[in-house]
C-alpha cells in the first residue's frame, strides 16, 4: 500500500489539488457509476481515467486493482479484514500505527490469528 493519506490533513495543498477538488464539488457532485444519467456516467469515466493513470504510474497489471478509499485507515481495514489470515501468525511492533494495531487486535480477539507484538 502506498500511504498518501497525509494530504487529507496537511495544511498546504497545491493550487492544482484545490482547483480540481473545487471544480469537482461544484460541477460533478455525483455517485460515479451509480446511475445511468449523464452526470453519473461522466463521473464514472473520470474515475476510470484516474484509476488507469494511477495503474500506469505504479505499473499495476490491471487498473481494476486500484481502489479508492476515504483514507488510510479504511484502506488498512479493508486489506486486513479482507485477507484470509485464518490460522496465521502475525508479528508486528508496538510502534505500529493504531490503524494497523486495532484490526490486528480484533482479528486476534475473534480467534482468526495469533499475534505477537514486539516492544
Feature names for model-found ranges:
Residues 1-119:
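Pyridoxal 5′-phosphate
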